[in-house]
Amino acid sequence: MFVVISYDVPDDKRRTKIHTILKSYGQWMQYSVFECNLDSTEYAKLRSRLAKLIKPAEDSIRLYFLCACCQTKVERIGGEAVRDETVFFV
């Protein structure tokens, strides 16, 4: 599943931890936005890790699920080109 994750976390320490966790699951797109291509196990693990870390009264994490058709309709204007980090072994 393709998930766009955004977060608003005022505490620097928690925000840094969330950023570090998300870097291991997807690609950092903007300051508090990641794009992740996850299977159901990865998603469950990620959601659990994030839920344990945040303070719900102060922090907000939003997850947007994009179907395969919607992924082809994503437009980008400006910014750095998205890198394909696929590794191939020959």
Residue map of PLM features:
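Extended, hydrophobic alpha-helical segments
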Residues: 1-42
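A broad, structure-centric signal for solvent-exposed, well-ordered loop/edge residues
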Residues: 16, 41, 45, 70-73, ...
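A broad, low-specificity signal for short, low-complexity segments enriched in glycine/proline
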Residues: 22-27, 47-51, 71
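Short, intrinsically disordered low-complexity segments
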Residues: 33-59
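C-terminal structural segments of small proteins and small subunits
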Residues: 53-90
